[in-house]
Amino acid sequence: MLITDEQFASVRGTVMDANPDMAAQMAGRIVDEGLKFVAACAKNPGLGLAPSRIVDEGWHALILHTALYAELCDTLGDQFVHHYPGYDPTNYDPPILDRTREKITELGWEADQELWGPPSDETLASVAAKCQHAPDCTIIITPRPKPGVA
């Protein structure tokens, strides 16, 4: 989709390393949603968006692949999507997640609704990520400074 199959497998492996009991299919779904989330943020700078707790796990895995993540952000329009974690996993604002899913849909993808639920719902997947983003921690994109420009 936005990265090569080899890169995808590597990021999926990172999700599985952090969540040893997780099936490869679920980890792949989480990476897919993380990619969609980053794209939605990069294409909508200035609009506060946030991932669900499960999708945040995929975003974390992408970020750990620093070169891949920087290249992804460049590909998406040179909008580096920074991560500002909110550490209270009970922080949950459904309208922000609704807005984020709408932006994903506007880009031509379908959000995997099962992965965009409340942080307390671990029936589908329990993830290592324990942060949840809320109104005071939505993601606002700022352009990355160009090398040599102060």
Locate each region found by the language model.
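Intrinsically disordered, low-complexity, repeat-rich regions
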Residues: 1-150
